């Protein structure tokens, strides 16, 4: 699969948040593009590019938009706002579900776009693990994506943000993890 270096929807989604992202802007943009490309590679087709672009742009954005490490609900809210304004015909429920489940421990199964949601979950894990978890992606493709979108300190930002959260919330150290459970309902 060819690496996509720019996508108009992903750019339009991120642009208004440049100031909130601050010094992490390049790191987060690159992360969003790596996850977008890895998810495309896992799906094996480009039929869902717009959905993946929106999901990639917003999946972790709540860290910066709402200044919290409990960021899934804020990220979903920002995605919904964007969709209402810019892409009202996009599959909002699927995008919100993909954001909700992207840190799920275990495979996403069932109906309702489970294949896309699980591909997105695995793509994010490939990136967050720095390729230790490969999800079956070709090594050459991963290297090509990383050459276009280097880490730029993204993992350090996550580590610092996560540790700061943990100090203030020791009983909820990783609030964004989701346990595998029931299958998704068909839509």
Model-identified regions with their sequence ranges:
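Divalent metal-dependent phosphate-bond-processing catalytic cores, especially two-metal-ion Mg2+/Mn2+ enzymes
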Residues: 1-8, 13, 20-46, 87, ...
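Short amphipathic alpha-helical segments, especially helix-boundary/capping motifs
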Residues: 8-16, 52-57
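Short coil/turn segments at secondary-structure junctions
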Residues: 18-23, 59-62
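Short gly/ser-rich anion-binding loops that grip negatively charged ligand groups
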Residues: 25, 65, 69, 85
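An active-site-proximal "capping" alpha-helix that borders the catalytic cofactor pocket
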Residues: 35-39, 70-86
């Amino acid at each position: 699969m060819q690496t996509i270096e720019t996508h108009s929807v992903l750019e339009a989604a991120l642009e208004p948040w440049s100031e909130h992202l601050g010094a992490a802007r390049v790191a987060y943009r690159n992360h969003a593009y790596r996850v977008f490309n890895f998810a495309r590679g896992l799906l094996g087709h480009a039929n869902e590019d717009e959905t993946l672009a929106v999901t990639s742009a917003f999946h972790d954005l709540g860290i910066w938009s709402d200044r919290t490490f409990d960021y899934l609900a804020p990220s979903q809210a920002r995605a919904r706002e964007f969709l209402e304004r810019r892409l009202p015909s996009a599959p909002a429920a699927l995008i919100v579900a993909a954001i909700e489940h992207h840190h799920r421990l275990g495979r996403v199964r069932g109906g309702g776009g489970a294949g896309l949601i699980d591909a997105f979950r695995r793509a994010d894990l490939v990136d967050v693990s720095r390729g230790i978890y490969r999800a079956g992606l070709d090594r050459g493709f991963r290297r090509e994506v990383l050459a276009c979108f280097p880490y730029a300190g993204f993992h350090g930002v996550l580590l610092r943000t996560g540790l700061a959260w943990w100090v203030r919330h020791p009983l909820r150290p990783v609030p964004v993890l989701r346990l595998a459970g029931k299958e998704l309902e068909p839509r």
